[in-house]
A protein has these predicted regions:
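Acidic/His- and Gly-rich active-site-bordering loop/insert found
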Residues: 2-109
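Zn-dependent metallopeptidase/amidohydrolase metal-coordination segment
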Residues: 299, 304-368
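Active-site metal-coordination/substrate-binding segment of hydrolases
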Residues: 79-141, 146, 341-344, 348-353
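A short beta-alpha structural unit
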Residues: 234-239, 247-255, 274-293, 313-316
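Acidic, glycine-rich active-site loops and adjacent beta-strand->loop/helix elements
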Residues: 86-88, 145-152, 174-177, 332
C-alpha cells in the first residue's frame, strides 16, 4: 500500500502546488479584530479559502468562528490531529519579488508563508486526500486543523480546545525533520522598576543579561541536560511603560529546570524590583520509542532513506499547548534561517516529499 500512496501523491502534485500557490498569495498577516474575524479580515478570508478547497476535495469541514477550522476524513470520537497555521509574520524589507506573489524560479517557490506554515499544512491536506482517494479505511478519523494565531499568541488553539476535544495523537508540520520527540520549556519573564531606580535597573540588566552569556551563567541558571542541551536566554526587549522601566527576556529551558527556579533566582538578585512571569509553556516530551514517534520516524526513513532518529528542538510550536502531538517537519537537515526572513522559500520537490512523508504518517498512525 505504501507504493500506491506514493504514486498517488505524484499524481496529485500539480494540483497540490497550484492550491498552495493560491493560499500563499493571500496576505494573512494579523489585522484588527472585527466581528466574525478575530484576527482580521485577511486571515478570515484565507481560512475561508482553505476550507473551500478542502470541501472541493470531498472533506467535511468546520469553521470555529474564524479562530480556527478543520477538514476531517472518517467518523469517530478519538481522532488523529495534524495542526498547522495560516497566519504569517509581516513581510519586512529585502524581497527580490513581491512577498505574496508565490514566485516560482528554478524549482523553488518564494513567498511569505510558503514554509511557515501554509505550504506544509496544505501538503498535509493533500496527504489525507491521497488516503481518501485510495479509499483506505483508517481505524481513526483524521483532522487537518488550520490555525490562525500561531505567530501572535495561540488564541486560536485555546479557542479550539474550549470547543473540541484534543486528538489522541498527531503532529504539527511547523518545525523540522526527523520527528521531534521533545521541546524545551519557554518562560517570558519581565523585570520592572520605578523611574527613580533607573541606575540600579540598568546596572542589573547590563550585568546579568546584556553583558552576559546567553546560558544565564551569571544568574546561576546555566542548567543543561543531555537531551535538551543548555538553558538559553533570548528575545531581550526594553520598554518604558507608565513611569516604569520594563525589561523582558525569554528563557528556553531544559526539562531539569522549573519556572519557580527561574523566577525565584532572579528575584533574589533583583532586589527592590518586580519580577513576574507573563507567559509560560512547560517542556513537552514523548518517549523516543513510543508508537507514534516510532511510526513517524518510519515514514520519514521510508521516503527519504535518511536517519530518522528522533531529535529535540529549542523552538516552540503548537505542541506546547495541543496535547498528544509532536513537531514533524517540514524542514530537512541543513535547512535553517528561512522562515520569517525575506525571500522565504521552499523547493517544489520538498513540498512533494513532505506530502509523501505525511501521507505515510497518516497511514501508519491510522492503522494502529
Amino acid at each position: 500500500m505504501e507504493e500506491e500512496i506514493i504514486k498517488k501523491i505524484d499524481m496529485l502534485s500539480l494540483k497540490m502546488i497550484e492550491d498552495i500557490k493560491t493560499i500563499v498569495k493571500m496576505p494573512s498577516v494579523e489585522g484588527t479584530f472585527q466581528q466574525g474575524a478575530p484576527f482580521g479580515k485577511d486571515i478570515a478570508l484565507t481560512l475561508d479559502k482553505v476550507l473551500e478547497i478542502a470541501q472541493s476535495l470531498g472533506f467535511e469541514t468546520k469553521n470555529l468562528d474564524h479562530y480556527i477550522g478543520y477538514a476531517q476524513y472518517g467518523k469517530g470520537e478519538d481522532y488523529i490531529g495534524i495542526i498547522g497555521h495560516l497566519d504569517v509574520v509581516p513581510t519586512g524589507l529585502g524581497w527580490k519579488h513581491l512577498p505574496f506573489s508565490a514566485y516560482e524560479e528554478d524549482g523553488y517557490i518564494y513567498s511569505r508563508g510558503i514554509l511557515d506554515n501554509k505550504g506544509p499544512i496544505m501538503t498535509c491536506l493533500y496527504a489525507l486526500y491521497a488516503i481518501k482517494e485510495l479509499n483506505i479505511k483508517l481505524h481513526k478519523p483524521v483532522r487537518i486543523i488550520f490555525g490562525c494565531d500561531e505567530e501572535t499568541g495561540f488564541k486560536d488553539l485555546e479557542y479550539y480546545l474550549k470547543h473540541e476535544k484534543p486528538p489522541v495523537m498527531g503532529w504539527t508540520p511547523d518545525c523540522k525533520y526527523p520527528v521531534v520527540y521533545a521541546e524545551r520549556g519557554r518562560a517570558v519573564i519581565e523585570i520592572s522598576a520605578k523611574e527613580k531606580q533607573v541606575d540600579e535597573f540598568f546596572l542589573f540588566i547590563n550585568n546579568y543579561f546584556l553583558n552576559a552569556n546567553t546560558n544565564a551563567e551569571k544568574l546561576g541558571l546555566d542548567f543543561k541536560d543531555e537531551e535538551f542541551g543548555i538553558n538559553e536566554m533570548r528575545n531581550f526587549v526594553l520598554k518604558h511603560e507608565k513611569s516604569k522601566l520594563v525589561f523582558s527576556v525569554t528563557f528556553s529551558y531544559p526539562a531539569n529546570m522549573t519556572l519557580e527556579t527561574i523566577v525565584e533566582t532572579i528575584r533574589e538578585k533583583a532586589k527592590n524590583m518586580e519580577v513576574t512571569c507573563v507567559q509560560h509553556y512547560f517542556p513537552v516530551k514523548f518517549e523516543k520509542d513510543c508508537p507514534m514517534v516510532s511510526l513517524l520516524s518510519k515514514a520519514y526513513e521510508k521516503i527519504t532513506h535518511l536517519d530518522g532518529t528522533p531529535v529535540t528542538t529549542t523552538g516552540g510550536t503548537y505542541a506546547k499547548l495541543m496535547p498528544h502531538i509532536v513537531p514533524f517537519g517540514p524542514s530537512f537537515p541543513g535547512q535553517k534561517g528561512i522562515g520569517h526572513q525575506p525571500n522565504e522559500w521552499m523547493k517544489i520537490e520538498d513540498l512533494n516529499t513532505n506530502a509523501k512523508i505525511y501521507a505515510l504518517g497518516i497511514y501508519y498512525l491510522g492503522m494502529l
